[in-house]
């Protein structure tokens, strides 16, 4: 089996392998000039032979990624309605994401 890791960012967990492309919530310090993304909250690492489980994180394990683009998610629509009161409210929201390509798993 090929190596993989489980990283946590934006209060969500992602299982990643080298070469994967994932969409994560916006991170501080990332811009068009600074394209390197480091995920330091690595919860689990499998290197092909043995597994390391963190408590809560695996020490000195880092997942390196590269920013591909800024993307926006699908539109989510919330609709409020109260019967017999002539009240309707339509609210839309689109979340901003970073599209990141995983370059390396450092253990």
From Swiss-Prot:
<dbReference type="InterPro" id="IPR028909">
    <property type="entry name" value="bL21-like"/>
</dbReference>
<dbReference type="Pfam" id="PF00829">
    <property type="entry name" value="Ribosomal_L21p"/>
</dbReference>
<keyword id="KW-0699">rRNA-binding</keyword>
<comment type="subunit">
    <text>Part of the 50S ribosomal subunit. Contacts protein L20.</text>
</comment>
<keyword id="KW-0694">RNA-binding</keyword>
<comment type="function">
    <text>This protein binds to 23S rRNA in the presence of protein L20.</text>
</comment>
<dbReference type="GO" id="GO:0019843">
    <property type="term" value="F:rRNA binding"/>
</dbReference>
<protein>
    <recommendedName>
        <fullName>Large ribosomal subunit protein bL21</fullName>
    </recommendedName>
</protein>
<dbReference type="InterPro" id="IPR036164">
    <property type="entry name" value="bL21-like_sf"/>
</dbReference>
<keyword id="KW-0689">Ribosomal protein</keyword>
<comment type="similarity">
    <text>Belongs to the bacterial ribosomal protein bL21 family.</text>
</comment>
<dbReference type="GO" id="GO:1990904">
    <property type="term" value="C:ribonucleoprotein complex"/>
</dbReference>
<dbReference type="InterPro" id="IPR001787">
    <property type="entry name" value="Ribosomal_bL21"/>
</dbReference>
<dbReference type="GO" id="GO:0006412">
    <property type="term" value="P:translation"/>
</dbReference>
<dbReference type="GO" id="GO:0005737">
    <property type="term" value="C:cytoplasm"/>
</dbReference>
<dbReference type="GO" id="GO:0005840">
    <property type="term" value="C:ribosome"/>
</dbReference>
<keyword id="KW-0687">Ribonucleoprotein</keyword>
<dbReference type="GO" id="GO:0003735">
    <property type="term" value="F:structural constituent of ribosome"/>
</dbReference>
<dbReference type="InterPro" id="IPR018258">
    <property type="entry name" value="Ribosomal_bL21_CS"/>
</dbReference>
